[in-house]
Amino acid sequence: VNDQQRAFAQRVADLGADVVLGTGPHVLQPVEWVPRADGGQTLVWYSLGNMLNTQLGVDQRTGIIASFEVVPGADGGPATVANPSGVLTWMHYDWTPEEEAALQLDARHALSIQPLAASAELLARTTYGESVEQIAEQSAAILGPLVALSPGV
């Protein structure tokens, strides 16, 4: 997360936003509560990673479907946001080891996106050598302790 992202999140929070969903850096980034000028807090997902794409790195092919609860306020008071959670996703495409070695980028085909937890077979067809569990662990560490991850399968 860079200074511009933090400044933007703080500005939007101070304007009263309850949630900020960031995209752009092509990788997952941390989730934080940012204090607002009105005393409330804003849930900030700095980056949801990638969804449909043909990026090359494991971290660039991992994303999250973000979720959170909107809790009604007591006695007609303002609603609040709680319990950030999500389902990790994996972006798959077919690309033979020979095509990859030759960097034939236009050879990538059969794009699909699905829950990471259901992607063991697809990951085994890549040259990364990483398991669903390893990617999930790395992703959880990046997102931070606020986010409860569910398998989504």
Predicted regions and their residues:
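Active-site/ligand-binding-proximal alpha/beta "capping" segment
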Residues: 1, 5-11, 99-108
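Conserved beta-sheet core of the metallophosphoesterase superfamily
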Residues: 2-64
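A short C-terminal boundary segment appended to hydrolase-like catalytic domains
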Residues: 59-153
